[in-house]
Amino acid sequence: MKKKAVILLSGGPDSTTVLEIVSKTDYEIYALSFNYHRRNSLEVQKIQGLIKDYNVKQHRVINIDLQSFIGSALTDDNIDVPKFQNTDQLPSDIPVTYVPARNTIFLSYALGVAEVIGARDIFIGVHTNDYTNYPDCRPEYIKSFEAMANLATRVGVNGEKITIHAPLINMTKEQIIKKGLELGVDYSKTISCYDPTEDGLSCGQCLSCIARLDAFKKNNVQDPIKYV
């Protein structure tokens, strides 16, 4: 009987690379995505086409309201998504695109799903470039959540260890794209943009777009998605 894995899938290149990695193993895959604001609704649409390329047992989209977490450009319509010209301009601290407790909320849902379906493995696509800007992407956070998961669940208390896997955690964005290209990831079906147009074009200037474009450039590969 195959082991089951829950994968947090955003529709971006990082989580898609994780999906590719896990798809080459013997896991039965349960993908979990979140629709939490109009600015990420395009991600959810992209995922519908993306997962057709993979043997995903089940894909769940969870609708949650994070708009009460004001102060983030990704959940508050009154805050503009900051734009940049190059990587030198990117913030070195926690940016306004940080969403309070986002990964904690997402991983908590994943943990609940894992218990229900009998999975003991949860995968998330955090990486080294996230550390500076997003504290809930750091290795110590992932380890702490895993420890909590094993203290606060029936399966954990019964001695069946739950593992939070972050296979990209020691990789840069450049290395992730390189790895994905080697594995055959179709990045044309992914999106990174924090502020896409209504017709699905990426802005090319938000933190996420700049980081993505830089990663493809360093791999001497043209980013296959369309920009404004």
UniProtKB/Swiss-Prot annotation:
Name the UniProt key words of this record, in alphabetical order. Answer: ATP-binding, Ligase, Metal-binding, Nucleotide-binding, Queuosine biosynthesis, Zinc
Please cite one Gene Ontology biological process associated with this protein. queuosine biosynthetic process
Record Pfam families? QueC (PF06508)
Please share the entry's free-text remark on the cofactor.
Binds 1 zinc ion per subunit.
List the catalytic activities from the record.
7-carboxy-7-deazaguanine + NH4(+) + ATP = 7-cyano-7-deazaguanine + ADP + phosphate + H2O + H(+)
Which pathway or pathways does this protein act in? Purine metabolism; 7-cyano-7-deazaguanine biosynthesis
Q: Where does Zn(2+) bind?
A: 193, 203, 206, 209
Task: Spell out the CDD domains in the cross-references.
Answer: QueC-like
Q: Which cofactors must be present for this protein to function?
A: Zn(2+)
Q: Which residues bind ATP?
A: 9-19
Q: Name one GO molecular function term.
A: zinc ion binding
Please state the Enzyme Commission number of this protein.
Answer: 6.3.4.20
The answer to whether UniProt assigns keyword Metal-binding to this entry is yes
Q: Family membership, please give it.
A: Belongs to the QueC family.
The protein, known as: 7-cyano-7-deazaguanine synthase
* Taxonomy of the source species: Bacteria, Pseudomonadati, Pseudomonadota, Alphaproteobacteria, Rickettsiales
